[in-house]
Amino acid sequence: MTDLPDSTRWQLWIVAFGFFMQSLDTTIVNTALPSMAQSLGESPLHMHMVIVSYVLTVAVMLPASGWLADKVGVRNIFFTAIVLFTLGSLFCALSGTLNELLLARALQGVGGAMMVPVGRLTVMKIVPREQYMAAMTFVTLPGQVGPLLGPALGGLLVEYASWHWIFLINIPVGIIGAIATLMLMPNYTMQTRRFDLSGFLLLAVGMAVLTLALDGSKGTGLSPLAIAGLVAVGVVALVLYLLHARNNNRALFSLKLFRTRTFSLGLAGSFAGRIGSGMLPFMTPVFLQIGLGFSPFHAGLMMIPMVLGSMGMKRIVVQVVNRFGYRRVLVATTLGLSLVTMLFMTTALLGWYYVLPFVLFLQGMVNSTRFSSMNTLTLKDLPDNLASSGNSLLSMIMQLSMSIGVTIAGLLLGLFGSQHVSVDSGTTQTVFMYTWLSMAFIIALPAFIFARVPNDTHQNVAISRRKRSAQ
């Protein structure tokens, strides 16, 4: 990329900065949840909605981000994304109640939903085709550093300042990024087809109300009748979308995607698989602090081996899948992640804390292999005219399933625990033990889906071609 103009390199730095902000925010909050709960007068068992409100908003808004960028311009939308994300961070820091914090996190989610896909679109428009891969590697590298720094930085800020600072640090960075975007980024636009607003609203309503219903009386305090009403509304909305999308060439996501068997299996497996694995980044720092008494900073440091394992495995996942095939790799990693989850709880309850970093490193390796394999299996056989739509649907499902996973984890804690965590450490650890065993069971379930994947090892070279675009 050394032969690119200086203006283009600056634009790539702006996109990289956006990737870093978004990835940092997805991990920095987890370590601070117990401190937030204490400050806001809430039970730590109910703080999962701080994560869900952000991730669910990202899932809902993702389908509209690319169309908005083409219609209004990448600079205008990227600038708007940074401003909304920064304002959301400010409102998060100023929140005095859990409900205020949830609304502020949703505003952050609107910005986060536009930042990454619009950033990818910007790179496609400003970089020559032959240098696109190198440019994407450059801008996504900070996005890999974010999860590495997030948990430890969050713990450090909570322990030596307050949880408010995990949001306040975004403000000066966001202001600089917004100004740089206006000054340096070109406002590319493209001719767009008519946006499927009806389909977008039906999907948004379906996803939001079903997730809210899943949280149920334990989290939101809704009556059984209200929960039943939400379920009915959500199911009707999704059924109406299917009817709307049938034989509709302008649908948000064409039903023709599901004619490709590997896409259907991969999408179903990704949805179920990320429900289970989405619980782990939320539950691990909460358990380390509440169940084992770790400090926020110590709990944050314990998450680093998991990220390192994930980053290290990405270098060899292509060879692993090419050697053993998608079906074997996905079944093995799914069952392996379930076993590693139980191993983590066992070593923690036995007091073998020195073993935990190695277990978390192994968890990161297994999870990374499974993620990359799921992504590429889903997209590898799609025809070119459906590849973009399939990738967008996969991105939405990834965010939705993670929000559902965190919701289920919070629900399990509520079922096995009480309104407030007991001062008896033995009781608290029992609550987490039952929750962890339930999580291990849920994590193992997608193996039944992956067992139906065709044994097509000779086609697995596709992973090296599509891996980066799918992640």
Swiss-Prot record:
Keyword Ligase set for record: no
Q: Per its UniProt record, what Gene3D superfamilies does this chain match?
A: MFS general substrate transporter like domains, Multidrug resistance protein D
**Cytoplasmic-facing ranges:** 33-48, 98-101, 159-164, 218-224, 284-285, 363-395, 452-471
Its recorded name reads Putative multidrug resistance protein MdtD
User: Which residues are exposed on the Periplasmic face of the membrane?
Assistant: 1-11, 70-76, 125-137, 186-196, 246-262, 307-341, 417-430
The family database entries (CDD domains) matched by this protein are listed as: MFS_LmrB_MDR_like
| Parts of the chain that traverse the membrane | 12-32, 49-69, 77-97, 102-124, 138-158, 165-185, 197-217, 225-245, 263-283, 286-306, 342-362, 396-416, 431-451
This chain is encoded by the gene named mdtD
Keywords assigned by UniProt, alphabetized: Cell inner membrane, Cell membrane, Membrane, Transmembrane, Transmembrane helix, Transport
Return the NCBIfam families for the record.
efflux_EmrB, PRK10504.1
**Membrane topology designation:** Multi-pass membrane protein
Which PANTHER family does UniProt cross-reference here? BLR6921 PROTEIN, MAJOR FACILITATOR SUPERFAMILY MULTIDRUG TRANSPORTER MFSC
